[in-house]
Amino acid sequence: YAPQIRRKIEEHILRSKPYARMFQYTEMIANAVEASRKWPLRELDSIEITQQELDQIALVDGMQEQQLLFTMLCLAKYRHAVNANSDGWISTPRVDVYKMANVSGTLEHKAAVQRHIHDAGKIEWPRRADSENVKVLICDLDGEPALHIRDFRNLGYQYRRWCGEAYFACSECGLVVRRNSNRMKYCKDCADEINRQKARERWFQLA
């Protein structure tokens, strides 16, 4: 069982970071394998987002608010896929949720973005003031999927891409980033690594 988990984690890392140096992830992989002993392996092809959910998100004023709500929805749908009794609750640390949603700015600004979503009636907070849990109130578990989410990196940018803005998926690692020119094919990290490889190849040709 442990070798299977390790292989799946390594495959996931290499899909999202084709040029990863695996020795840098040794400790992280070992910790993940150890933690996985408590839960069975569960593979998901994608998280399905319905048109009704997207319509609910579009009702919220502000693009950053929509990005954050979309990200929270994706996390809630994932949680439901692995635990049908989750009832829309997510427990991901807020700092991680903001990062996944590509919501930038001060902590006060980020808190204000979440408060706007709460005041719009799309999320619910727990009674405990010190809890980071959030309940997403717009989950549609029966509708036909309009969008399939297979990558939880840059979910905010994925939402903006769905909205028709100038974002694209890197041809090498699949990361969704902003398109600054029509010629862009790669994210910055992959472009830098490809350029380094080309430079090494040219050096060997000249040697």
Where are these regions (language model features)?
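Modules that initiate DNA replication and primer synthesis
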Residues: 1-65, 81, 86-88, 94-156, ...
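Short Cys/His-rich metal-coordination motifs, predominantly Zn2+-binding knuckles/fingers
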Residues: 170-176, 190-193
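Short metal-binding segments enriched for Cys and/or His
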Residues: 192-207
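Donor-sugar nucleotide-binding helix/loop cap in glycosyltransferases
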Residues: 159
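Residues immediately within or flanking Cys/His clusters that coordinate Zn2+
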Residues: 165-168, 184
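Short helical patches
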Residues: 127-129, 162, 202
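Short alpha-helical "packing" element that flanks the helix-turn-helix/winged-helix DNA-binding module
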Residues: 67-75
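Cysteine-rich micro-motifs
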Residues: 181-194
